[in-house]
């Protein structure tokens, strides 16, 4: 069975958002990534991964510009990405994109569900 282990949220200020989740919920900072496609801070409670994303002007990866905040995507850890991809398509979902490889960036495949909601599948997880 797939396990929900990753949520990504776009925020206008990475450090401010990270300080909030670290301070309020005791989440632990795993890593910070600055890449040409955008910047991220990964936090965890030991089971779930919360990745905070910020996409500066010109990166074209964020929703509605760099000041928008909200759920960006979520992810499932699966045993077999290929089998899961077949099931996604069988149930009406579709492939969305493969992230380019950059140091520190988890290059998982992204899909859209039947309503257009973006999610990742990964055999290795995040963080």
Label the model's feature ranges.
Residues 1-16, 71-76, 122-127:
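N-terminal beta-strand motif that seeds the catalytic metal site of vicinal oxygen chelate
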Residues 2, 10-50:
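Core segments of cupin and vicinal oxygen chelate
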Residues 70, 74-88:
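Mid-chain, well-packed structural core segment of small domains
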